Amino acid sequence: MNPNQKIITIGSISIAIGIISLMLQIGNIISIWASHSIQTGSQNHTGICNQRIITYENSTWVNHTYVNINNTNVVAGKDKTSVTLAGNSSLCSISGWAIYTKDNSIRIGSKGDVFVIREPFISCSHLECRTFFLTQGALLNDKHSNGTVKDRSPYRALMSCPLGEAPSPYNSKFESVAWSASACHDGMGWLTIGISGPDNGAVAVLKYNGIITETIKSWKKRILRTQESECVCVNGSCFTIMTDGPSNGAASYKIFKIEKGKVTKSIELNAPNFHYEECSCYPDTGTVMCVCRDNWHGSNRPWVSFNQNLDYQIGYICSGVFGDNPRPKDGEGSCNPVTVDGADGVKGFSYKYGNGVWIGRTKSNRLRKGFEMIWDPNGWTDTDSNFSVKQDVVAITDWSGYSGSFVQHPELTGLDCIRPCFWVELVRGLPRENTTIWTSGSSISFCGVNSDTANWSWPDGAELPFTIDK
């Protein structure tokens, strides 16, 4: 062959090899596509690793995670569908209280970004429990924490964070501008109630799933206030109690029935010798029971129970094991206000079981220190001070504060009963610890169980003063 023929022959062979290679690649692509189609069937998800897709459907968050493994899409998780929290079950039978959470927020806040708060409480949906709290619009160990002993200011807001976590700007959700608040879930959405404004003209702003649905104006112009713990939802309706009037005398108390954030009914209690503040409420067999604070003249706690039509009964816990603070030594109780050391008080709770009652209270008679749970088997109706169980929660040497009830519905736990739980606020700083310029709190919580529990002390544990205090 001459040189030109050699070049033509080599070129022809190269072109032929290239065409064959191209056909093989096309065949390979067709084979891979066919194999992928067979594996995924009718799925049309893109093959992106760890793609998180969140959609909002009928007031329900639907959260899917698609994980790509070897060209196969695997769906992880399940739809978080809406339910209606019935509240028709009875309280679970319990023998004691198991530690549930401890957020250590003040200890963490000495070095981290943690909100200055008070009045924390817990509420659960059918999917999760959350901690709600009233922030002061300031962080611990910062100059704006100065003066946060004040209860009512325009900087306070209701916020929430995952249960057991220290409340910070990074994990917390804004709920409402408020210096008094409540919140609860009906199975379809969160209802929040935030009260803010001047003492003589405060307004409660109701939100459902974050949208303002109604407002309630102070009707006595004497510091409208609400529970500082969860409201109660039964069969799609939610219930809360508000107070307006003196803290040291007869005031006005109203029960509100709320559906999807709209007030559908309200009544004023006819309770001339009673005083209701900061009620801790829970559902039990379709009715609502609230145990409250008498800041006027009772060292035992007043209660009100009502059905979904707001037909109600009222009374005081009769036990000689007194639940308020300050209070006298245990002795002879009364089904009316026990007026010895009856002035002032602290938010608290109890759980009624027939004629018996679990009473949560500070260990100290005078100071908000320590905390204990006492089972009085006849204390709802009898006036003696005999009890059969006492469980220590916080030692008398450590600070406590407000306490309140919350429940876990069968839709969350899978039980056939409503689980009773409670939280305790552990207040630090002013007015009792005057080496600081601030007031804040951490919290612990417990749930009722019918098994072994521990007697111990779970105190706040922060070492004061902080750097900002020096």
Swiss-Prot record:
Gene3D superfamilies xref list? 2.120.10.10
A single GO molecular function, which one?
A: metal ion binding
Q: Which GO terms describe its biological process?
A: carbohydrate metabolic process; viral budding from plasma membrane
Task: Supply the alphabetized keyword list.
Answer: Calcium, Disulfide bond, Glycoprotein, Glycosidase, Host cell membrane, Host membrane, Hydrolase, Membrane, Metal-binding, Signal-anchor, Transmembrane, Transmembrane helix, Virion
Q: How is it modified after translation?
A: N-glycosylated.
**Record membrane topology:** Single-pass type II membrane protein
Compartments where found = Virion membrane; Host apical cell membrane
**Spans annotated as Involved in apical transport and lipid raft association:** 11-33
Q: Pfam families recorded for this chain?
A: Neur
Positions of the region Head of neuraminidase? 91-470
A cellular component term from Gene Ontology for this protein is: virion membrane
Span-the-membrane segments of this chain are: 7-27
Q: List the disulfide bonds.
A: C92-C417, C124-C129, C184-C231, C233-C238, C279-C292, C281-C290, C318-C335, C421-C447
> How is this chain's activity regulated?
Inhibited by the neuraminidase inhibitors zanamivir (Relenza) and oseltamivir (Tamiflu). These drugs interfere with the release of progeny virus from infected cells and are effective against all influenza strains. Resistance to neuraminidase inhibitors is quite rare.
Q: How does it assemble?
A: Homotetramer.
Q: What family is this?
A: Belongs to the glycosyl hydrolase 34 family.
Q: What is known of its domains?
A: Intact N-terminus is essential for virion morphogenesis. Possesses two apical sorting signals, one in the ectodomain, which is likely to be a glycan, and the other in the transmembrane domain. The transmembrane domain also plays a role in lipid raft association.
**What name does UniProt use for this protein?**
Neuraminidase
Tell me which species this is from: Influenza A virus (strain A/New Zealand:South Canterbury/35/2000 H1N1)
Q: What is the lineage of its organism?
A: Viruses, Riboviria, Orthornavirae, Negarnaviricota, Polyploviricotina
